[in-house]
């Protein structure tokens, strides 16, 4: 028994074809939106590629760009099919291709759904990418004279100012690295010598942070050096007083920014997916309604349309059987090829 059977007369078939034509062209616009969102996210990620570990984070924007292009192509073609469906002569050329096209549409809908899920689920991968990339970027902060790294100081400073953050996980991350270049250290100074000697790796470590960590909203002038030395500043206690620095780490700030972007894009992609599913269902109804016309010479006669020719269990069983037959036929062909040509009679 057919699933979700609906009766159609000529008027209903015309309305269905016209409605699907309009929906397909709206879906082309939705594809352009997906393409634009993917392009925007890719540009945003490239802006901060210096503080990201690898290109894994570009999977989501690349996927959005890909499904956006495919959506435009498939729905333009579907719009043409719906436009030609009302003319028997034009419809005849599409008839052999409709079933394969519907199968491709179903496969595309599955891909679109997976892309939407990726928008929500790739937060963990992005977090590890940012953590490692920011850690390396901070190490190169002092290398203003090194070719290929001279831009890193500006990149980190602009990042901390724009996102109101400091360090990787917090401002104390700057205490663990030498972020002041040796070029600007006075090695004749006893303080500099003592600090370098006291460190196993011979690095100049200070309890200070770059100027970009300072919060301009703080009423007190920025304290960026000797942050843990209470006696170095008047009326100051670093353990109880709220520091005039950004307390949030840049990893959390960037992760929240990109996660909110991808979550919004995931919602848009899910809405487009629902729209595409409804179009695929409509195309199936149009296809079966035109196929079941009892008298092709009488366009006014009634016909029936359905989503599945049989029930869901029966359809699944038939699919598995056809899949097994395909596997067996491939196996027979492979065995025949291995056996080689038959020997000639002597």
UniProtKB/Swiss-Prot annotation:
Q: Which UniProt keywords apply?
A: Cell adhesion, Cell projection, Disulfide bond, Glycoprotein, Membrane, Sensory transduction, Transmembrane, Transmembrane helix, Vision
Sum up the protein's function in the record's words. Essential for retina photoreceptor outer segment disk morphogenesis, may also play a role with ROM1 in the maintenance of outer segment disk structure. Required for the maintenance of retinal outer nuclear layer thickness. Required for the correct development and organization of the photoreceptor inner segment.
Per the UniProt record, which residue ranges are transmembrane? 25-43, 62-80, 100-123, 265-290
Q: Which GO terms describe its cellular component?
A: membrane; photoreceptor inner segment; photoreceptor outer segment
**Signal peptide as annotated in the record:** none
Coiled-coil residue windows: none
In residue numbers, the region (Interaction with MREG) covers: 341-346
Quote the protein name from its UniProt record.
Peripherin-2
* Location of the protein in the cell: Membrane; Cell projection, Cilium, Photoreceptor outer segment; Photoreceptor inner segment
Tissue specificity is:
Expressed in the retina (at protein level).
Q: What happens when the gene is disrupted?
A: Knockout mice fail to form retinal disk structures, resulting in an absence of the photoreceptor outer segment. At postnatal day 14 the photoreceptor inner segment is stunted and at postnatal day 21 shows disorganization and cell lysis in addition to outer nuclear layer degeneration resulting in a gradual decline in photoreceptors. At postnatal day 21 mice show progressive thinning of the outer plexiform layer and disorganization of the photoreceptor synaptic termini.
- Name the domain of life this protein comes from: Eukaryota
Gene transcribed to yield this protein: Prph2
According to its UniProt entry, the protein's GO biological process terms are: cell adhesion; detection of light stimulus involved in visual perception; photoreceptor cell outer segment organization; protein heterooligomerization; protein homooligomerization; response to low light intensity stimulus; retina development in camera-type eye
Residues with glycosylation annotation: 53, 229
């Amino acid at each position: 028994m057919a699933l979700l059977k609906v009766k159609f007369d000529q008027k209903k078939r015309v309305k269905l074809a016209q409605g699907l034509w309009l929906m397909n062209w709206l879906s082309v616009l939705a594809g352009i939106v997906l393409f634009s969102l993917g392009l925007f996210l890719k540009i945003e990620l490239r802006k901060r590629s210096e503080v990201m570990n690898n290109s894994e984070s570009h999977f989501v924007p690349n996927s959005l760009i890909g499904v956006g292009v495919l959506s435009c192509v498939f729905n333009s073609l579907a719009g043409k099919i719906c436009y030609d469906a009302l003319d028997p002569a034009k419809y005849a050329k599409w008839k052999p291709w409709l079933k394969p096209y519907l199968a491709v549409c179903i496969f595309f809908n599955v891909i679109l759904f997976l892309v939407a899920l990726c928008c929500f689920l790739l937060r963990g991968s992005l977090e590890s990418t940012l953590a490692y990339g920011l850690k390396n970027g901070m190490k190169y902060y002092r290398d203003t004279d090194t070719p290929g790294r001279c831009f890193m100081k500006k990149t980190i400073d602009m990042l901390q100012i724009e996102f109101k953050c400091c360090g990787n996980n917090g401002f104390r991350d700057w205490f663990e690295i030498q972020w002041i270049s040796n070029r600007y250290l006075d090695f004749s100074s006893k303080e500099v010598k003592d600090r370098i000697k006291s460190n196993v790796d011979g690095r100049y470590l200070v309890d200070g942070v770059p100027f970009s960590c300072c919060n301009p909203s703080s009423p007190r002038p920025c304290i960026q050096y000797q942050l843990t030395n209470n006696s170095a500043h008047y009326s100051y206690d670093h353990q109880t007083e709220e520091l005039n620095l950004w307390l949030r780490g840049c990893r959390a700030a960037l992760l929240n920014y990109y996660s909110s972007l991808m979550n919004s894009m995931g919602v848009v992609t899910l809405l487009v997916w629902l729209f595409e599913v409804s179009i695929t269902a409509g195309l199936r109804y149009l296809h079966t309604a035109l196929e079941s016309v009892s008298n092709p010479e009488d366009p006014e006669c009634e016909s029936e349309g359905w989503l599945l020719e049989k029930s869901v269990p029966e359809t699944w069983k038939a699919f598995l059987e056809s899949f097994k037959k395909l596997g067996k036929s491939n196996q027979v062909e492979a065995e025949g090829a291995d056996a080689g040509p038959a020997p000639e009679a002597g």
